[in-house]
């Protein structure tokens, strides 16, 4: 159990105190995978008993487990700096997370930012909960064949070899959600990833209760056509918020990492409607104050757009039966011109209209974004379009080796990362 506790905590991806222990269990497999859970699942009973019989190994294991538990209970920066903070939970929604090669549910920069944000939140003690999707194949792996052509490979992500655990109810059942799509329901399984102090919840449609075609909805990251992408974003946004509700979690803040998860603002408003008896317009106005949208895109073509007919097909019933509004009002939230029936539904527009704050990922990007979104704010001077900026960073313990950290600490001091970007120039 203690080995499992360590193997299933992604903190090992930036705190490498356990590396030598996994290497001792199976040096070849560890060097190939860097996946503690695979090593623990694959090691023979004889080998495991042999290393556990060594007093030095046992002492190191006990010390590592105790250190992990002490860290989880000790107040971190957030608790020390804001001991009376009313902020209980921030729900962070992202289409991808880059935490480790052992959990390949990412493509590139967006996942990099999301993964590092969770790791930094763990170190700082910020009360963040991540919400995402578990992909059976993830993003494709590139292979260049003998003719110089690219081949796309989709290796299968076996959940039994990933550092994740099924999310269970108090009665021990696997937590599953039912999402209604046109003409059928999709069952979603819920998983948990431990990222130090932070939890990441993942949903996937590969449930035996689903038809084969529907089991593959969460198969590929950024794969398939617009209809598949829409289904994934419905699962992420609407399914993700329902998952939090099923867990009894009521976040004060909903952070949308790009527009993929913008449907969460609709489900959050629907939940408020059910609790308060208010209509959709009031519910959206109230809940948007607690929603934050981070845009990463620098060109308008990068925003997800869906044909009006597709939105009507998949969200028409949801709008009328759950939100109490005609579908045209829902479509208007994702359009520049609400009266243009041919205009596609823009997820970034929905995210902006459903969020109380919007930010780009650098000062320059915020300036570009203000130009991109200026048409939504008629008669506003472009410099005053309400898009701020928070400069993207990285989680240094993940990317900085111990020798490099020692060198930079000697040259620039231990507090070199605590200033603003001007001090880093």
Q: Model segments located where?
A:
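Catalytic cores of carbohydrate-active enzymes across secretory and cytosolic contexts
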Residues: 1-425
